[in-house]
């Protein structure tokens, strides 16, 4: 845990591998036994993340076929560590020869060198987005646990590319709408404009950033552990650990700072099935604990750092120079970031679901009686 390659408390994932190494993968420890699981379950998510899926993503061609090496027997999980492997097949280390001695601006090259005194400069090594294969594979397992155990649905989509913003209702958006176009934006008009923007940036050897929005529906009440493991804090850490992420907000986010308390508060009301809130500016979390409403969050992603435009930089021996990077890179990370965000949200919710049941649901203790307190005057 101290080296930053593992994530989670009870549902713990450890990813490994580099961009141009032999393979990448993940070990998942803490998955409950008897979960139906196949390579097809995982492959469906990896196919959404893989490179080369459209003309607005990196042209690197990787099938990203997964192998389950342990932890599953006759189609069911054993409760033991699950090892998932994906072999790299289309590595071109020669495209990165300049990076052996030259730092890419705004990439991890310089900081990895400063920290470790050595780095794998082929495609970014551990800092490459190929590391997220392990996250998405583990997220596929977490998604299945959440769906079967609690009916939780997690859906992300591209909400903005540069200045093109989609008009989307998180409460009603569907997976079919998201997957209807290559940019994964459920607003068709905005999607067309986004694609044009990305195509133009790619022609110029440049890149664009934007925002991915994610909604988690049917999340049980009670997930989250005050005070340092609040649900939104763990969600923020999870998505902010993704490559190129630069910002996080949940519910009303920064826009909520323009409101008064009266305007911002989510008032309660009763339904036959229990209490609900009339609005959802809290984004489904209050006091660090899920309240049963949709969890709605947004993640900002910067423009891809590796571009073909000439940029000023320095070398390992301290010489100033100019670099126009080669290699194959996404002109915009947003379309492929969608399954990555879903995976990280799933990992957090699955971990907290297991933690909640371990602390609050595992023992048959008596309910605390409701005190007889007079209602306040309206």
Curated annotation (Swiss-Prot):
Coiled-coil spans in chain: none
Catalysed reaction, written as an equation: 5-O-(1-carboxyvinyl)-3-phosphoshikimate = chorismate + phosphate
Top-level class of the enzyme under EC nomenclature: lyase
Subunit structure: Homotetramer.
Family matches, as Pfam families: Chorismate_synt
Residue positions binding FMN: 126-128, 287, 302-306, 328
Gene from which the chain derives: aroC
Keywords assigned by UniProt, alphabetized: Amino-acid biosynthesis, Aromatic amino acid biosynthesis, FAD, Flavoprotein, FMN, Lyase, NADP
Native source species: Synechococcus sp. (strain JA-3-3Ab)
Name the UniProt record assigns to this protein: Chorismate synthase
Family of this protein: Belongs to the chorismate synthase family.
Residues engaged in binding NADP(+): 49
């Amino acid at each position: 845990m101290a080296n930053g390659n593992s994530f989670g408390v009870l549902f713990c994932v450890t990813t490994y591998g580099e961009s141009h190494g032999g393979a990448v993968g993940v070990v998942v420890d803490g998955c409950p036994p008897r979960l139906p699981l196949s390579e097809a379950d995982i492959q469906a998510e990896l196919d959404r993340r893989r490179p080369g899926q459209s003309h607005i993503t990196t042209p690197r061609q990787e099938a990203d076929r997964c192998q389950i090496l342990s932890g599953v027997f006759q189609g069911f999980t054993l409760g033991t560590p699950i090892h998932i492997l994906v072999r790299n097949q289309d590595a071109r280390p020669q495209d990165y020869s300049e990076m052996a001695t030259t730092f890419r601006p705004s990439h991890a090259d310089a900081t990895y060198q400063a920290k470790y005194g050595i780095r794998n400069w082929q495609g970014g090594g551990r800092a490459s987005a190929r590391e997220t294969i392990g996250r998405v594979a583990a997220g596929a397992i977490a998604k299945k646990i959440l769906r079967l155990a609690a009916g939780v649905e997690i859906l992300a989509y591209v909400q903005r590319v540069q200045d093109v913003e989609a008009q989307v209702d998180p409460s009603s958006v569907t997976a079919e709408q998201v997957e209807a176009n290559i940019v994964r934006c459920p607003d068709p008009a905005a999607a067309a404009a986004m694609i044009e923007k990305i195509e133009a940036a790619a022609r110029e050897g440049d890149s664009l950033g934007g925002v991915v929005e994610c909604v988690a529906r049917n999340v049980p009440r009670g997930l989250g552990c005050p005070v340092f493991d609040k649900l939104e804090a763990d969600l923020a850490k999870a998505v902010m650990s993704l490559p190129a992420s630069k910002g996080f907000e949940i519910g009303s986010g920064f826009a909520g700072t323009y409101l008064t308390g009266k305007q911002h508060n989510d008032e309660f009301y009763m339904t036959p099935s229990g209490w609900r809130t009339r609005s959802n500016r809290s984004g489904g979390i209050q006091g660090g604990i899920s309240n049963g409403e949709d969890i709605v969050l947004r993640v900002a992603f910067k423009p891809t750092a590796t571009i073909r435009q000439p940029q000023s930089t320095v070398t390992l021996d301290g010489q100033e120079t100019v670099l126009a990077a080669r290699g194959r890179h996404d002109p915009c990370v947003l379309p492929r970031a969608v399954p990555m965000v879903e995976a990280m949200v799933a990992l957090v919710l699955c971990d907290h679901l297991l933690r909640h049941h371990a602390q609050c649901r595992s023992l048959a203790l008596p309910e605390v009686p409701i005190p007889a307190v007079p209602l306040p005057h309206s």
